[in-house]
Amino acid sequence: EAGWEVAAIVRPSSDLEALSVAVRGRVDFHVYVGGTLTDIVREAKPTVVSHLASLYLAAHESADIPALVASNILFGTELLEAMAKNDVRRFVFAGTSWQHYQGMQYSPVNLYAATKEAFEAILRYYEETAGLYAVGLKLFDTYGEGDTRRKILALLEEAAKTGEELALSPGEQKLDLVHVDDVAEAFRLAAEYLAADRADICGEYAVSAGTALSLREIAARLEKLLGKKIPARWGARPYRSREVMEPWSTGRILPGWQRRHKEIM
């Protein structure tokens, strides 16, 4: 809609049927099967690369480590190498607010966040040796229509509709929720800046609602929106290890970006 030609790198297992027919018709898909990224980047000839691929796990088991490293470190490194070999220098990537436990400059909430930080260390090498211009967008909790993930808003809405009791933590942890459309707008805006050779915009930014509400407050707001009571059993579950009680709040906002969706927050 903004005049961009879009190419996407997907896995053989990617569910493209989850995309609308209109979207599928406007995107040039390239299937990644390992060791093909240099050829894919050469064929696509991108002006800007946006890197969103990741494996998110709030908590991991030992068996999850290879997949976490492959998705969050190995794939991204191969992508950077492919960009360097094809002289593609503009790069937008997704980080996470969970790299900043208790508001620290760097303290990973979990191994997922640690792999994100590890990738950024690798990116630094390509910035210095291949002349990459990079914008990092630190994401918080996201929501939106058609979300198939079993995230907290979906669970709350499902409980309201079915009437089945939902076992939850005490609910005092705060969340910073941003609609997926607003997240997409941040990526579009960052890409436009880089396409216009705005090197001054390089750096990291928070894609944040600018406010945080407790899970209890979010549930109460959702009840009003749905017109139904949520049968929540508060305190039935303990807080997770390293639960984020207060989201990171000191990140700078990408110039020109502001959220439009304020239904929940």
Please report, for each region that a protein language model flagged, where it lies by residue.
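Active-site segment of SDR-like NAD(P)-dependent oxidoreductases
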Residues: L55-L57, G95-M104, F140-Y143, L175
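C-terminal substrate-binding subdomain of Rossmann-fold SDR/epimerase-dehydratase oxidoreductases
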Residues: A160-E164, L168-M265
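Conserved cofactor-binding/catalytic machinery of classical short-chain dehydrogenase/reductase
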Residues: V48, F75-E78, R90, A118-F119, ...
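Glycine-rich NAD(P)-binding loop of the Rossmann-fold in SDR/ketoreductase-type enzymes
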Residues: A63, A67-F75, N110, A114-T115, ...
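Conserved Rossmann-fold NAD(P)-dependent oxidoreductase catalytic core, especially the SDR/UDP-sugar
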Residues: H51, L74-L111
